[in-house]
Regions:
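Short, small-residue-biased leader/transition segments that mark boundaries at the very start
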Residues: 2-9
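N-terminal secretory/membrane-targeting helices
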Residues: 12-13, 52
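Cleavable N-terminal signal peptides
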Residues: 16-17, 27
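Acidic, serine/threonine-rich low-complexity disordered tracts
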Residues: 30-106, 141-230
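Acidic/charged, solvent-exposed loop-and-adjacent secondary-structure segments enriched in E/D, K/R, S/T
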Residues: 110-132
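Beta-strand/loop-rich accessory regions of lumenal/periplasmic or secreted enzymes
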Residues: 132-140
């Protein structure tokens, strides 16, 4: 009897440990990383980098795009509740000077170019397009209800999102599958591609701003301090 009891205890312990490990793995796969550095190649080979960092329930997303003659820096930050990002601010800095910004408070958003601003009430969620990329990544590409997108200068209502297919994508010398979506933003569209094998990180972001089209394609990935390849 003693032998049976002695054997049963470690087996049950192993089963519990396995269940906990599986649960933790699933939670990690569905959630947001502690940190990520994504390097992109933009139109005409223009380099771009996007970093995501979190500390407790706080997050910061910084995207840098080097265009001829100057650099653009987009920064947004706020809090995380579950897998939901709740922004507090968004800044568009060009050539080291503030170009536009948005500040969020409840259902109110104050936005505009530097030196001018206006405040609007929104009935749903308002995100910048980089924060939206991570929001979609963490929630299996489910669009928040009543969504508006801001670029700091204006507000754009989002009328829907459609999946436009899957394709093989080259990242860091390897190939992985990405799922592509188009988000209807005002009168134009923003296209996102997500890589399921890499926790749905944004593999491509294509959008238009101030008459210029930016097509950012992922070239390398570092998640939680470790380089990731297909």
């Amino acid at each position: 009897v003693t032998g049976v009891q002695t054997c049963a205890l470690p087996i049950s312990t192993l089963l519990i440990a396995a269940a906990l490990s599986l649960s933790a793995a699933n939670a990690y796969a569905a959630g947001l990383p502690q940190s990520a550095t994504l390097k992109y190649s933009g139109s005409y080979g223009i380099p771009a980098t996007m970093t995501f960092t979190r500390s407790g329930n706080q997050y910061t997303i910084v995207s840098r795009i080097k265009v001829p003659m100057y650099s653009i820096r987009f920064e947004s930050g706020g809090t995380i509740s579950g897998n939901t990002l709740r922004p507090k601010y968004y800044k568009d800095v060009r050539g080291g000077k503030l170009y536009a910004e948005a500040k969020f408070s409840g259902n109110s958003i104050t936005y505009g170019k530097a030196g001018s601003s206006e405040t609007a009430k929104t009935g749903g969620t308002t995100l910048d397009l980089f924060t939206l990329a991570w929001q979609l990544a963490a929630n299996d590409a489910r669009l928040p209800s009543g969504l508006n997108i801001t670029n700091g200068k204006k507000l754009y209502p989002v009328s829907g999102m459609t999946k436009v297919g899957s394709e093989n994508y080259k990242i860091g010398g390897g190939t992985t599958t990405v799922n592509k979506y188009r988000v209807k933003r005002g009168d134009d569209t923003v296209t996102y591609s997500f890589a399921p094998a890499f926790n749905n990180i944004p593999a491509e972001i294509n959008y238009t701003d101030d008459g210029k089209t930016y097509d950012l394609k992922l070239t390398s990935v570092t998640i939680n301090g470790k380089a990731v390849k297909p």
